[in-house]
Amino acid sequence: MTQQLPILSLKKIYSGKVRDLYEIDDKRMLMVASDRLSAFDVILDDPIPRKGEILTQISNFWFNKLAHIMPNHFTGDSVYDVLPKEEADLIRDRAVVCKRLNPIKIESIVRGYLTGSGLKDYKQTGTICGLKLPEGLVEASKLPEAIFTPSSKEEVGNHDINISYAECEKLIGADLAAQVKEKAIALYTVAAEYALTKGIIICDTKFEFGLDENGTLTLMDEVLTPDSSRFWSVDTYQAGTNPPSFDKQFVRDWLENSGWNKQAPVPKVPENIIQKTVDKYQEALDLLTK
């Protein structure tokens, strides 16, 4: 059964794959991370216990760590400033009061290693999103430098589509595209260097950006979590293999092997797969923040 978050006195204005948004006023909203899990763009019936709390802690850690690179969606307000105590107590570890921003209509993906849809593109064309890459790269090869590979932002339930940088410029304008690319690569580079010291390789990640009321580019949503990124362990990494990741890969692999057709409804995921997934999320938090 899909996890239901507590009913709050604030008005719900959006329900996404993982997060629900509530209106506070015209400048702020409350973002609440559920324990829902999506795989192949379908939301699973079975929640992953404590996932929303772990994701929120990882995101908050990175928002603070990367604040010197660019502004973020934090307002400085506590959930207790905007909700009655009995409601705030229920969601305090999975909720953030954030600025209302105008989201930029692309997925800002940065890749430092070759895998996933990028590997498929490379095998077919020698490029990713129109960017030429060296010959001879294999699964999990480290790229010569981090690359910005945007995709279109599709509605929930539709697959995002990789686009070229020129298409990105058409969608959001050349000036904004240049800012987004520069900031996304800077964020990834700093985070990846830090994570390596903690035994984690950040293979790739997706950033979400918005514009504030003054048109300032602002980092929003979630940052460098196992949901928005592929984390690999330094200990098990080897180019030419598909390294295990700190995320929903257990669930994805189980679903891939289950014969499921990737349409709702989703088959029931075994308890041991769910527990392994919780453990991996927790391990990522522990490694990054200790």
UniProtKB/Swiss-Prot annotation:
Organism domain of life: Bacteria
Pathway: Purine metabolism; IMP biosynthesis via de novo pathway; 5-amino-1-(5-phospho-D-ribosyl)imidazole-4-carboxamide from 5-amino-1-(5-phospho-D-ribosyl)imidazole-4-carboxylate: step 1/2
InterPro entries recorded: SAICAR_synt/ADE2_N, SAICAR_synth, SAICAR_synthetase_CS
Signal sequence extent: none
GO molecular function terms listed in the Swiss-Prot or TrEMBL record: ATP binding; phosphoribosylaminoimidazolesuccinocarboxamide synthase activity
Any GO BP annotation: 'de novo' IMP biosynthetic process
Name by which UniProt lists this protein: Phosphoribosylaminoimidazole-succinocarboxamide synthase
Native source organism of the sequence: Haemophilus influenzae (strain PittGG)
